[in-house]
Amino acid sequence: MIDKFNLEISKGEFVAITGNSGSGKTTLLNIMGLLEKPNSGDIIINNIKNPNSKQIRILQRDFYGYLFQNYALIENENVENNLKIALKYQKNINHNEKINYALESVGLRKYNKKKIYELSGGEQQRVALARVILKECEVIFADEPTGNLDKKNRDIVFDILKSLNKNGKTIVFVTHDLELSEQADRVIKL
């Protein structure tokens, strides 16, 4: 349960949320990402107080990207089809060119025809990250994005997040990893 909580995150900030299991880290992230509504209180995003359902859809579609610990991919589809989902609302663009760019960005250039179930956990998380890159969102919410990964893949995924942040993206991530949280601009401890 999160009670009497006030938080302001500036554009381009890299924020870690840490705390014990059950402290509300994921709940806070989901409230900020408009995936859950708070029981009470206000949410103000880009000067919009308590966005209505239409505003929430626009924010989620156009401004927010989500990176979940469980990857949220369609396992029996190939990488390319999973990535096309992120391009659903982008018209008049070369989808293949954008997909190739996103896969190159995460080190999976030749993986577009591979089925998701053929990939390791680290590769699946990088596909999920490529999907976020394709959305060209302003804010990325990441819930334990490296929690299921070995050190090599953890470092790859985190380096990509840091690179996105250096290019102006706001990153808010939940982690139990002290080493990763220390690399954030700010750490919020619940």
Please tell me what each predicted stretch does:
Residues G33:
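Helix-to-loop junction immediately C-terminal to a conserved catalytic motif
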Residues N94-Y111:
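Conserved ABC ATPase "signature" region
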Residues I140-D143:
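Catalytic Walker B motif of ABC-type/P-loop ATPase nucleotide-binding domains
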Residues L129:
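Hydrophobic anchor residue at the start of the ABC signature
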Residues K115-L119, E123:
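Conserved ABC ATPase signature
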Residues D42-I58:
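ABC ATPase NBD Q-loop/coupling interface
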Residues E77-K84:
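Short coil-to-helix segment of the ABC ATPase nucleotide-binding domain corresponding to the Q-loop/switch region
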